[in-house]
Regions:
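Glycine/tyrosine- and acidic-biased, solvent-exposed loop/turn segments at the edges of beta-strands
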Residues: 2-206
């Protein structure tokens, strides 16, 4: 009865070894990736200089690639921005004095491009917008410190285009304007607890 048992164990042993090898490889790859991710230098903004629109370290001969950082007087991180070949390129974060994330936006070759989000010092989201090549484009939303939506604006190429809406703390609509290329087409306002967004006709959308 013991021989079959030994055979079973022997059959499983190669699979066990293979599994261990795969796990070891994954750990090594993850460790390498982590080192690569953090290997870029972090340099104070005050130690960088601008030449012909590109950022250089004070004695550097090549445009800077790494992270540009700023700190408050007490040493708490104020901002951290990725720089590639002298240009803002990647994620740029700003922080409140309490360490809470204040703003996060994305850059492509020194131009804001992508989602831009801001937060209150409490951690509650303040606003969110999409930026396309430096201009707001799409839906901009703003909240108060309780997390209640207070404003919503549709934009196109940096101009209000579509509905711009303001809300009461109750969530009911306070005012609405129909916009086209930054110009007001028509506007309405309501007392609190009267109008919900879902009940407003939208046939006059530009």
């Amino acid at each position: 009865m013991e021989a079959p048992s030994e055979s079973v164990h022997n059959n499983h042993f190669p699979k066990f070894v293979a599994g261990m090898v795969v796990a070891l490889i994954l750990v090594m790859v993850w460790s390498w990736y982590g080192r690569e991710k953090t290997s870029l230098p972090e340099v104070l903004r005050s130690e960088l200089t601008s030449r012909d629109g590109l950022l250089f370290q004070e004695l550097g001969t090549q445009p800077f690639t790494g992270f540009m950082i700023e700190s408050y007087k007490d040493g708490i991180l104020k901002s951290r921005s990725q720089v590639v070949e002298g240009l803002l390129h990647g994620v740029s974060d700003g922080y409140h004095p309490n360490g809470q994330l204040q703003v996060r936006e994305h850059f492509e070759k020194n131009i804001s491009h992508g989602l831009r989000t801001k937060w209150f010092a409490s951690g509650i989201k303040m606003s969110e917008a999409t930026v396309v090549e430096g201009q707001l484009d799409g839906t901009f939303q703003r909240w108060d410190e309780t997390g209640t939506l207070v404003e919503q604006i549709e934009l196109r190429a940096g101009k209000a285009h579509g509905f711009s809406r303001a809300f009461y703390p109750s969530g009911y609509l306070k005012a609405q304007a129909s916009m086209q290329d930054g110009e007001v087409i028509n506007q309405q306002s309501w007392p609190d607890n009267e109008m919900k967004v879902a009940s407003i006709p939208t046939s006059d959308t530009p």
